[in-house]
Amino acid sequence: MNWTEKPDAGYRITRMAREDLLGIARYSEIHWGKDQRNRYLKSLEKRFEWLALNPKAGRRRDDIANGYYSFPHGQHVVFYLISGQMIDIIGLLHKEMDILVYFHSRE
């Protein structure tokens, strides 16, 4: 799966979010196998496309940084920014992760 840019789908994936996706893919494959990994990654891709069409559906996360949005998906939370007619996927965190530590440790 190509996790760089999908401008035709209305979203871009930052380097940090690509690293998160790779970690999710590795973990999923080790614990649940390739088929489940592929299903979950495909469901994330569909979520990104849906968020690109419905960017305001997410929760504003100005508590983290101005302009951040989040939307839950499975065991993870998708973080993104609205950039004109597109969204930028900026991070994918497990729902149990410390959000502030995640974003501030990667600045």
Specify the residue positions occupied by each region the protein language model found:
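Arg/Lys-rich, positively charged N-terminal/basic patches that mediate binding to nucleic acids
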Residues: M1-L41
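Gly/Ser/Thr-rich beta-alpha loop segments that engage phosphate groups in nucleotides
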Residues: D35, R60, L93
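Conserved N-terminal glycine/acidic-rich loop preference
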Residues: M16-I24, G67, H76, L100-V101
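Charged, solvent-exposed alpha-helical segments that act as regulatory interaction surfaces
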Residues: I30, K34, L53-A57, D98
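Hydrophobic pocket/interface hotspot
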Residues: A17, L44, I89
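Enriched for short, Lys/Arg-rich terminal
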Residues: L81-E107
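Basic/aromatic recognition patch in beta-strand/loop cores that engages polyanionic ligands
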Residues: E45-K46, K56-I87
